[in-house]
Amino acid sequence: MKKTLLCWLAALGAAAVIPACGGAAGDKSLSGLDRERFRSEVNGRPTDLYTLTNAAGMEVCITNFGGRIVSVMVPDRTGTLRDVVLGFDNIADYVRIPSDFGASIGRYANRIGHGRFVLDGDTVRLPVNNYGHCLHGGPDGWQYRVYEAHQPDPQSLALTLHSPDGDAGFPGAVTAKVVYRLTEDNAIDITYEATADRPTVVNLTNHSYFNLSGDPTHPILDNLLTIAADGYTPVDSTFLTLGRIDSVGGTPFDFRRPKAIGAEIDSDDEQLRNGHGYDHNWVLATAGDLSRPAARLVSPVSGIALEVFTDEPGIQVYVGNFLDGTVRGKHGIPYAHRTAVCLETQHYPDSPNKPQWPSVV
């Protein structure tokens, strides 16, 4: 079992909480999402939009297509609710436009080098989809699957996916369960479980794109980021980890104290060139410890803060380096360069080929 907590810290208890865009009417969410635009079928399986709410007025919308978080409405310093994640406002765009917006990633999050690894003496070969590597489970990863959904109460949603033996090249049949729970203290509790009928590799994460300003046109370079990590795993020019852990000390990768994401992102640094900015795995000092945050993100514009708690050993930080304005998201807004940051809790990239790192078998 893997657990991640996304804890939102903002000005609660305001006299009024007013949506920043649109409002709930009929089957519309506070973020302006129309549930009917998510009710469809993909590969013969029904899709829908599910809404979680709490007494504090926070709202989270999730679709069972890819197990994706579609919107998160959280109050800013004035008490105004703002949507702080990127995504689409209809199922057709999620199907038509390849993306990881808000997705539950599997069977293996991040990269497996050259699309192959050895398990129990057998070489497993996977389809490659990113610079000759298998990224996020390949071109038919779980972010493009329809999960079975069960909503037992207004604050939780359970999503289940059955992946057969040989699915996308991976050995063993796997049943995965993702449970989203919205707490009364404005935390999204994400729990992952996976069971397999034979040895295989599994690495699950959530791929939400956060923009805590609540304005998806506003770059995230002014966001203050803190990461509880003394080391990170450097990559080559194809984004594949080099198999070692380097110290963050004296480098642009040192976020042990709060620092603006943009403070050093344009530094003359080989790793920043290789990643086109930050797109790296940090080695968490909090591994296995849910009592202290692994990362913290604060928007000076909205005052909204996000704390990430996880029992995973790593976190991939990606700052929207490849967003270029060609994709239009919710409300027709184009998503431009570096207008979001992803905080993907995980095991280290390419772990199946790195026996020195925590096992994913």
Spans of features found by a protein language model:
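Bacterial N-terminal signal peptides that target proteins for export
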Residues: 1-9
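Bacterial N-terminal signal peptides
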Residues: 9-19
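An exposed, glycine/acidic-rich loop-and-rim segment of catalytic or binding clefts
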Residues: 21-361
